């Protein structure tokens, strides 16, 4: 039922939808006879994507609909609004800042989130500035040079 609700919402969107389907999701769509929801001009179904291709899609997207915590975080980093189809998220900070909207698996709530989507004008780097690896390497270098 949750999967069907999410797929129903896609019919509302006029924007192109690129839908990388995990094999289990694809099997569930076929098993529950939901493939008719994918027969729309604006929906392009593809195999799961690698990291670089996923990042490219996110960076060039108007918005992202996802159930992935990792994608939720990547949307925030790339300043792309996201609509979350999970009932809860571990990235509540991104929801509080307005970069992600918690819609859950409801066609109505997903569509409402899209219609009321407001892209925030600021970002407070609540998940960091993306400098953790550089800072860690510098600290390790300092420690090694003290020895």
Task: Please give the residue ranges for each predicted region.
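Short internal beta-strands
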Residues: 16-23
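Nucleotide-activated sugar donor-binding and catalytic core shared by glycosyltransferases
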Residues: 1-13, 25-147
